[in-house]
């Protein structure tokens, strides 16, 4: 009987020492919370960056589609912005009526990404304006201007203040179309740059410079 009791006591003691104490559990929970607090914002930022860059890529692709169609059909086409079913879009205005019609090339901005109202100011959380390396001009066309492509496939500033609208080449400046999103900790910025020769590229703001 005594032998049984001693064995049982040893067994009970073994069970107690093989588990976790409350302090150990609290430490584990604390470590998990710290890691999650660091990782989750980084993950959300990475997802936002992917969506922002995807929208910029889709817009650049749409611009190239407009360029190809303009050269193919020997017609000037402009790229306009609007909404469809509550989503922000950009489209190639094939019939020149200034509104989106079924069958026209279109792209939709993803997530919370929206076209900017114009060139960022460089203050209040906004980046500085993008400057194309090697360009000697003093500024660029931006979201306040309408990008068009002539029948030669060259970009132009589509001017609707004239009747009919004019789109002369070569353009006086290069084009930069900005977009931004809303994310944890602020906003992200990207842009599509179109050179005077019609070449398009994507740039993103990393918090201190465009690259």
Q: What are the residue ranges of the model-derived segments?
A:
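N-terminal helix-rich module
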Residues: 2-10, 23, 29, 34, ...
